[in-house]
Structures are given as C-alpha cells and as structure tokens.
Amino acid sequence: MAVLKQPQHHHGKHGGRSFYQLIAYLMLTSRLDNYGMLFTSFGGAGIYKSQDYTSTTSQASILRLAGLCTAHCVLLGAAGNTWNDWMDRDIDSKVARTKDRPLASGKISSGEAFTWMAFLYSTSVGMLKAMLGDRNVWPFMVPLTAIILVYPLGKRPIARKLRIYPQYLLGIAVGYPTMYGWAAVYGPCMPISEILHRCVPLWIFLFFWSFYANTSYSYQDVEDDRKMKVNSAYNLAGKRIRALLAILASIALSTIPFVLRPFSSAWLWLSWVGAWVPGIIQQLLSFDPSKPESGGVLHLSTVKLGLWTVFACTLELYLSNRAVI
C-alpha cells in the first residue's frame, strides 16, 4: 500500500509533467514509498557473529555492515519491483488495485523505468562491494539477479502448469541476503559452500515467512487475478486459503529453534518466540477469506514482526559477544 499520494494533475501520458511528478512516479514504481520494502531489511539479520567460528570483526563494524546490507537489499528490491511492474504492466492495468501504477497507466515510459532500474541496480551493487570488501560480489549477485528477472514469469499460466508459484522465487530472494552477512563478517576465508551451510536455518525461516506474507498480500487481488488466470499460491489453496497460511506459518515458526540454537541467549528466545507465536496466531484469527483486503492487514503485521526481530537482534549484539544483527 503506497504511502506517497499519486500526483493529481496529469497532462496526457507525459506532457506537462514536472520533474517532481516524474520522481514521485518512479518512487511509486519501485515501492521506495511502500512499507513492503521494509521486508528486505530483515536480510540484514543474516549477519551472524558466531560463537563457534573465529572472527575479529567488531560490533561497530557489524552494525555498519548491517546498514550496508539493508541499503543494498532495499535498492535491489526497488530495482526488482520496477522490473516486475514493467513485465506486469498489461496485467496491472486490468486489476483494480494496480491499474493506477505509473507503468500500467502510462504515466512513465519504459525508457524512464529502465533508466531508473539501472541506477537502482548499479547503486545496490556498489553497496554490496562496500560491504564485502575484497571479495568478488558477482558469485552472489548473479543468482539473485536471475531470480529477480524470472520472478514475474512465475505469475503466468505456464508456471501454474509446472506447479511453480511466484512465492517460491520470492522466498528464495528474500532469504538470499543472509549469505552476505557471513561473507562480510568472515571475509574470503570462508568458502561459499560453508556460508550456505550456516545460513540454511535462517534462509528456510525467511522463505516460509515471505511465502506466508506474500500469499496473504496477493490475496487482495484474488477476484481480478482469477478472472485473468494469474498464477499465485492462493490458487493452489482455493477455499482453504486460511489452512495454507496456517501451514506456512507453522513451518516458519518450527524453524526458529534451529535459527537460535547456536546462541545461548535467553533474550533471543524470549524476543523471537514471545513475539512470533502470539503474533502469528492473532494474524490467522483476524484474517477473513471473505474480505480479501484483510490480506494486506496481515502482511503489514508480518512486517512489524520482522522489524521487531531486527531490533531484538541488534540489542543482542550489545548484550553479548555472540551476536546476531
């Protein structure tokens, strides 16, 4: 749900448009004005300082790296949103909630969108280079970039026939930045295979969390999407959408002990379990399948849980020499 208001004066498709209006439209296209972008900030929580692996990285450095990781995730996510809107512009123009998006309504051109996307992408790469130092960023960037490019195709009917839903791709992308944290803290001394092994629990948690949240968010468009045969996970669930959400949430919650096991921290257990379990229960009870708009409320609630978790992990960094950000 956008925070910025659409500029109210339109002069054709592009004529008479001010520079401010262009920037506002580009911001809307990339969702830099959207609370959903805060989702990517949880990727910064992938920066672990493990108790069983030697690291000389200071707490201040970890905070700096977390900030760079968050900036990278937000900028790359914004570039991905721009790409998604360009790919979906014809679909979006026929959906009530998205028909006024700048690309769908013709308020900005494809050239303007691609220029903006290139700027966002290149800036995100720069942030990652600053974060990883001497390490080559492209072994990390290429797979994630490929996922972002393919993501819009997951909504097409052919993907539905293959049982591939866009939430699969989104979940992988949201969890991917956990690898950056390990690579930044431990540097070139840790091979990518070892980084991946250590990130698996948090990655699985983020995969099912984002699957759960995006399914509820997309459910807002269920009526229009079904008419156009847009592929999404709620098509798999049908009338059992609440049951699907409950299953996804349960899997996400069940991974929390594996995420926290390396850390002997009562605070992390209390702050995670004490917030997530009642939070998820409240979300599922308040979700009403007969009111698609309730999916947006659920999604916002999950973002708040994510932000709370980032705060809790940041506080743990100050409470212990074994830290998670």
Swiss-Prot record:
Primary enzyme class: transferase
Pathway the protein takes part in: Secondary metabolite biosynthesis; terpenoid biosynthesis
Reactions listed under catalytic activity: 6-hydroxymellein + (2E,6E)-farnesyl diphosphate = verruculide C + diphosphate
Keyword tags: Glycoprotein, Magnesium, Membrane, Transferase, Transmembrane, Transmembrane helix
Catalytic activity, EC: 2.5.1.-
Subcellular localization: Membrane
Membrane topology category: Multi-pass membrane protein
Membrane-spanning intervals of the chain: 60-80, 113-133, 138-158, 169-189, 192-212, 243-263, 267-287, 295-315
Biotechnology: Compounds in the chrodrimanin family such as chrodrimanin A or verruculide A exhibit strong inhibitory activities against protein tyrosine phosphatase 1B (PTP1B) and therefore, they could potentially be developed into drugs for the treatment of type 2 diabetes or obesity. Furthermore, chrodrimanin B, the end product of the pathway involving chrodrimanin A or verruculide A, does not exhibit the PTP1B inhibitory activity, while it functions as a potent blocker of insect GABA-gated chloride channels.
PROSITE patterns: UBIA
Major location category of this protein: membrane
Gene Ontology molecular function terms on file: transferase activity, transferring alkyl or aryl (other than methyl) groups
Record-linked InterPro entries: Prenyltransferase, UbiA_prenyltransferase, UbiA_prenylTrfase_CS, UbiA_sf
GO annotation (BP), single: terpenoid biosynthetic process
Glycosylation sites: N214
A Pfam family this chain is assigned to: UbiA
Keyword Membrane on entry: yes
Function (record text): 6-hydroxymellein 5-farnesyltransferase; part of the gene cluster that mediates the biosynthesis of chrodrimanin B, a meroterpenoid that acts as a potent blocker of insect GABA-gated chloride channels. The first step of the pathway is the biosynthesis of 6-hydroxymellein by the polyketide synthase cdmE. The prenyltransferase cdmH acts as a 6-hydroxymellein 5-farnesyltransferase and produces the hydrophobic metabolite verruculide C. The FAD-dependent monooxygenase cdmI further converts verruculide C into verruculide B.
Protein name per UniProt: 6-hydroxymellein 5-farnesyltransferase cdmH
